[in-house]
A protein has these predicted regions:
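Asparagine/serine/threonine-enriched low-complexity, disordered tracts
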Residues: 206, 210-213, 218, 222-243
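Hydrophobic alpha-helical transmembrane segments in integral membrane proteins
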Residues: 182-204
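Extracytosolic (periplasmic/ER-lumenal) interhelical loops and adjacent juxtamembrane/interface segments
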Residues: 41-70
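N-terminal secretory signal peptides and thylakoid transit peptides that target proteins
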Residues: 160-179
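N-terminal secretory signal peptides
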Residues: 90-166, 231
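N-terminal signal-anchor transmembrane alpha helix
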Residues: 12-37
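Structured, non-membrane catalytic/scaffold regions adjacent to prosthetic-group chemistry
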Residues: 195, 220, 229, 238-565
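Individual transmembrane alpha-helix segments
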Residues: 61-90
Length: 565
């Protein structure tokens, strides 16, 4: 009988093990999709948690910015994911190789196949905690090993002493089966959400659905999960503010935002929608349904409490504009956006537990956590809808926190616990040297530069100062020597539960634009903002957003046949 391929052609066995490892990763993706049950998910989490703070800053800073220049979003996270996939492939390949060695000693292909699949399944089940979806990993690896074993023996003479031709057939069989598994795994892993068309139609017929956001409603959730998130018109606990504000719908808010937009070419509208930025600690977003979600309030409270999704939505339904900006956003970056949110004030939940401490730690289902003052949380919002649709999975479905006027890192997504603390502690980013729990820095960004048909130049952007609001934006076209006031978009309206007399949204950005006769050649355009307290945006520019967020005046060189800077 011919000797095993491992003895006669070790290179073929190593290649078979590698291909089986790849097939195991793809098989995991086929059953789990891009969820926490995918084999790469726990590995990326472990890499992130153990990554040195300096390396993590480099990944979310220079690496991410370089990726944006190449048109690649979140390059740092993508590299982390690739590393995790590589490690998973190496782990599975090692286990398959061990199975092949064991099978060689026993001189039976069935041991090789069964052991390869079993070891890979066991490893995937232990790492992900999901033995069912781990079957995909085991099946993928076992299939490649099985095809390699059987193709090697096909047509092999019984009295041959050479395994070379059989080894080649084994390699070709491994390669073909790995390609087949990869194609099938890609198709299955990217299968449409299990949210049914009927549920999607139900959400869209509530009268306030933004098609863009509704379409991204939490893939992988159950059929009822997309129904009526933020759209229920029969809520009995809507509070009457006395000014008719509760009569407004999401469509009304969106219409006002469109009307008040300056309509500048190349400038994002006042409502971001699907373009809303996304920054997460983990590569794979949690996949939590409304039915399984709950929020616990624990710690230094008179009585701890748990709230389900139905409990939160029964407390009322408020609409409000809200802008978020990430503390890692560069001075003229794009990690700042605005939308219409549906939810309830956090204070309604806190009054039931009577908190005794002065600080809180907000925790997420993905292991993220951030600490800040209880007083700040009292003015915050629990959002369960966005632009008339359910809160998308990537933005915290089913419920997230929104902390007005503060850096986005404390607006925790996939919120599942509020722990009241007696004293301060460090959150995830503070443990890594950041200080992003306070109010946002005032900024005026310069994102649009247009040469108009009449020969004039138009520059425009967004401006934001948190709850301080924006009083004016000033533009200089001579490098800061002289200043002119820009045109501002109208203030967005207050929320449906705003106090009587409120004239504008508490926490929303504005657009600005300035049109002028350009001088000959290149010239430097500088922009700065004055907030609602009359305070001028600080001029000194930081080298990076770390640790307190970017500051400075945005400047660009314009003219001379193009835009520079």
């Amino acid at each position: 009988m011919a000797r095993n391929v491992l003895e006669e052609l070790p290179g073929a066995a190593l290649l078979t093990a590698l291909l089986a490892g790849i097939a195991g990763v793809v098989g995991s993706y086929a059953l789990a999709g891009y969820t926490e049950a995918f084999i790469a998910a726990p590995i990326t989490s472990s890499l992130t948690e153990r990554m040195p703070a300096a390396l993590l800053r480099f990944a979310i800073g220079p690496v991410t910015q370089f990726g944006q220049l190449l048109g690649i979003e979140h390059l740092g996270q993508q590299l982390n994911l690739l590393l995790a996939i590589g490690l998973a492939t190496g782990l599975f390949a090692s286990l398959v190789l061990a199975a092949l060695l064991t099978g060689r000693r026993l001189d039976t292909r069935f041991v090789r196949i069964g052991l390869a699949g079993g070891l890979v399944w066991l490893a995937a089940a232990v790492l992900t905690g999901s033995p069912v979806t781990a079957l995909g990993a085991g099946a993928g690896s076992a299939l490649v090993v099985g095809v390699a074993a059987f193709t090697r023996s096909v047509g092999e003479p019984r009295d041959t002493t050479s395994a070379t031709s059989g080894g080649r057939r084994a390699v070709l069989g491994s390669l073909a089966s790995a390609l087949g598994v990869s194609l099938l795994g890609y198709v299955l892993g990217n299968r449409p959400s299990t949210v049914t068309p009927q549920a999607a139609a139900s959400a869209e017929t509530n009268g306030e659905t933004n098609a863009g956001d509704a379409s991204e409603a939490s893939p992988g959730t159950d059929a009822t999960d997309a129904e009526s998130d933020g759209n229920d018109e029969n809520t009995e606990n809507d509070e009457d503010t006395g000014n008719g504000a509760n009569d407004r719908t999401v469509e009304d808010f969106l219409a006002v935002a469109e009307e008040r937009s300056l309509g500048v070419a190349g400038l994002e509208e006042l409502v971001s929608g699907e373009d809303f930025y996304e920054v997460d600690v983990q590569n794979v977003n949690p996949n939590v349904t409304r039915q399984e979600w709950s929020l616990s309030i624990t710690g230094t409270v008179e009585s701890e409490a748990d709230f389900g999704y139905a409990d939160v939505t029964a407390m009322g339904r408020e609409l409000r504009f809200g802008t978020l900006r990430c503390v890692s956003d560069t001075l003229n970056g794009a990690s700042m956006d605005n939308d219409v949110w549906t939810g309830v004030p956090v204070a309604r939940l806190l009054k039931d537990v009577n908190p005794q401490g002065k600080f809180v730690m907000l925790r997420s289902t993905d292991g993220y956590y951030e600490e800040f003052e209880l007083e700040t949380l009292m003015g915050s919002f629990l959002a369960y809808g966005k632009n008339g649709g359910p809160l998308p999975r990537k933005h915290g479905h089913p419920v997230r926190a929104l902390v007005p006027g503060h850096w986005g890192e404390i607006s925790v997504k996939w919120l599942d616990e509020i722990e009241v603390l007696e004293g301060p502690q460090k959150g995830f980013w503070e443990e890594r040297g950041w200080h992003g729990t306070g109010p946002v820095n005032t900024v005026a960004k310069l994102h649009a530069t247009n040469s108009l048909d009449d020969g004039r130049m138009q520059v425009a952007g967004h401006t934001y100062a948190g709850t301080r609001g924006i009083e004016r934006v000033e533009v200089s076209t001579d490098g800061g020597e002289t200043w002119q006031r820009a045109v501002l978009s109208g203030r967005l309206p207050p929320g449906t539960a705003a106090p009587p007399g409120a004239e504008a949204a508490e926490n929303a950005w504005r657009q600005w634009a300035y049109t002028y006769e350009p001088p000959e050649g290149e010239h430097e355009v500088v922009v700065r903002a004055v907030d609602g307290t009359g305070t001028l945006q600080p001029r000194e520019e930081t080298d990076s957003p770390f640790p307190n967020g970017a500051t400075g005046w945005v400047s660009k060189t314009v003219g001379g046949g193009g835009l520079f800077g």
